[in-house]
Amino acid sequence: MAPAVTRLLFLQLVLGPTLVMDIKMQIGSRNFYTLSIDYPRVNYPKGFRGYCNGLMSYMRGKMQNSDCPKIHYVIHAPWKAIQKFCKYSDSFCENYNEYCTLTQDSLPITVCSLSHQQPPTSCYYNSTLTNQKLYLLCSRKYEADPIGIAGLYSGI
């Protein structure tokens, strides 16, 4: 009986944190897929007053948060085309406490930026469609999934 209890305690101590981390990575990857990828690009009804207003309304509802994020990036490319960049993450981004990488290719992206000319109780966004490289946050160093976007690459 004692060896079985010892084995169970060992598994809980060793594998418990691993299982929690794996679940956290799966949730991060799923949230990224749901909130940061729109492929093919969706057309929202005119009642939303533009692409970003429809998308950000959906995003705030999905996150159950009424705050207006200042900026949000949406990638218009297939999951596989984005996921490949996290096969090997060459850097650790301390500001985000995550592994990160710069995409090797430019991707079609919509930048949704909060408009400064708005009443404080509403969220109105400007849309900018661009084709750029970006910094992806990855779930781990090797064979990872994207879990966030740190920003756009502004270099040459």
UniProtKB/Swiss-Prot annotation:
Protein name: Probable inactive ribonuclease-like protein 13
Function: Does not exhibit any ribonuclease activity.
GO molecular function, one term: nucleic acid binding
Keyword Cytoplasm: no
Alphabetical keyword list: Glycoprotein, Secreted, Signal
Organism expressing this protein natively: Homo sapiens (Human)
Annotated localization: Secreted
Species lineage: Eukaryota, Metazoa, Chordata, Craniata, Vertebrata
One GO BP: defense response to Gram-positive bacterium
Pfam hit, one: RnaseA
Positions bearing carbohydrate: 126
